[in-house]
Amino acid sequence: MQPLLLLLAFLLPTGAEAGEIIGGRESRPHSRPYMAYLQIQSPAGQSRCGGFLVREDFVLTAAHCWGSNINVTLGAHNIQRRENTQQHITARRAIRHPQYNQRTIQNDIMLLQLSRRVRRNRNVNPVALPRAQEGLRPGTLCTVAGWGRVSMRRGTDTLREVQLRVQRDRQCLRIFGSYDPRRQICVGDRRERKAAFKGDSGGPLLCNNVAHGIVSYGKSSGVPPEVFTRVSSFLPWIRTTMRSFKLLDQMETPL
């Protein structure tokens, strides 16, 4: 089955439909201070994704959310309002995992280095990451949040969230031929009408207040289960990348 990337393109073809968090609810304003809203410019046009703050100068998201120009909004609840909690920062660098495969959507993870550090407060604050190779048991209840649209004609401007359960790997293996249990997580009970959908790509899967996953892809119908990038499998790359670019910037600083 051809997987559906869950980013939301602004320039959609006639008849295409984009969706929001399915079966969810509006989040309590500013209760998720790590959430990032990404406005992306690429050769294919404009799109938007989610992401999450992992350090004062880095946001983690999906590699398929790459663009030549990315504007990041943090501290937002309603993305169409000028909230005094919001911080708008451009991405200095978009660093995709070197083994990201656009065809199979393997290693769908990317770091955005911000052009300046965020001002940390109760509305903007990094989220905790898991330990290396830390797993999740099937049945674990987690939460996904995002700003995906409802339809072509009506959208949601406020952050929404939904609770989803981790599934056994075989649920995704039977649907998605390229699913890799070592680097991906199968999420969402097919018996429930709850899921992430277009526009939610790059957002975090929070389990016990730890960002274990990144929204990656699912079926075009929006019916679960869906595939999330397993953050714990990429911790060495995340840490090495953030450290190396910090050192590079120090070397480039003029005397």
UniProtKB/Swiss-Prot annotation:
Residues 19-20, 245-255 form a propeptide. Residues 21-25, 97-111 are annotated as: Important for antimicrobial activity. Belongs to the peptidase S1 family. It comes from the Eukaryota. It comes from Homo sapiens. Two C-terminal truncation variants have been identified, one which ends at Arg-243 and one which ends at Ser-244. Keywords: Antibiotic, Antimicrobial, Cell membrane, Chemotaxis, Cytoplasm, Disulfide bond, Glycoprotein, Hydrolase, Lysosome, Membrane, Nucleus, Protease, Secreted, Serine protease, Signal, Zymogen. This is Cathepsin G.
